[in-house]
Structures are given as C-alpha cells and as structure tokens.
Amino acid sequence: MKFRNLAVVIAALFLVAACESTSTESGKGSGDGKQMAKKGKKKGPPKGFSITPGSSQDLVVNVGDRVFFALDKSNLSSDARSTLEKQAAWLKKYGSVKITIEGHCDERGTREYNLALGERRANSAKDFLVALGISPNRVNTISYGKERPVALGHEESSWSQNRRGVTTV
C-alpha cells in the first residue's frame, strides 16, 4: 500500500513538473528557497487523478509539504510559517494522521554539522506545529543532513532547494 501511494505521488510530481514552463531566473536572490516554495503552490490534483483525503498526496498537492531555510539557519521564514499554518489546519482536519518532518541541508559543511542543522530545522518546524495545537505525539522528526539532495548542482540555486524541511505522512 505504501509503495502504491509513493508511486502515485511520484507520478503526480512528474505531471506537475512536465506542465511547468521554463524559468529565466538566474538563481540569485535571497537564497532561502522562497522562489522554489512559490513554484510548488499548485492547487488541486493533476487532471485525471483523484486524491484520497488525508493522504500524503492530499498534503503535497493541496497544502504543501516543504519549507525552505536560509544558509546555516533553522529559523522559520514568513513563507515557511504560512505553509506550516496550512499544514496545522490540515492536521487538525485529519486528526488520526501522523507525520514525520525531515530536515535537509545543502552540500556545504561537514556531515556531522549538517545532521545537527537538519535536526534543528526539523525541530523548528515541529515546535511551530505544536505551538499551533498539534500534539507532539503526532509529529516525528529526522535529519538527513546533506545526504538526500533534490538538486545536484553546486551553485546557490541548487543549494537553496536542498535547505528544506519536508513533511511526510
């Protein structure tokens, strides 16, 4: 069942990515992932797909599963807080759902440093959700440090995509 859910999420992400137009952004800017966060805010499932309410696909497509961080920081930006507020509302709607928040970093820094930073990032997101009324028993955290990048480049535009927190169901 989990494999099927994962396959549906991956298929949906490919469809969404295939529909996106090419960007002319230079990759320069604040470097906190705000541009990437805005790109991921598409509403509703792709045509021909139905989303099970309360599922991981529902979270990804209708709420957003990622928040982004500035270099060497674990504090939440206003965009990150906005996404987490939506996640909290979604979690209140689906009271039996448990989540894991993954903390990720870019490739710079040692493995140990990035694991600790990823943990701080995941805990920052968890603490915010708990402050909004979500039971801490429903929220697990894990740090992957720099071990699971989503962008493989060696420049700021890639690094800003990798400095993230990802909420999984």
Please tell me what each predicted stretch does.
Residues 95-104, 119-150, 163-169:
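A non-catalytic structural micro-motif
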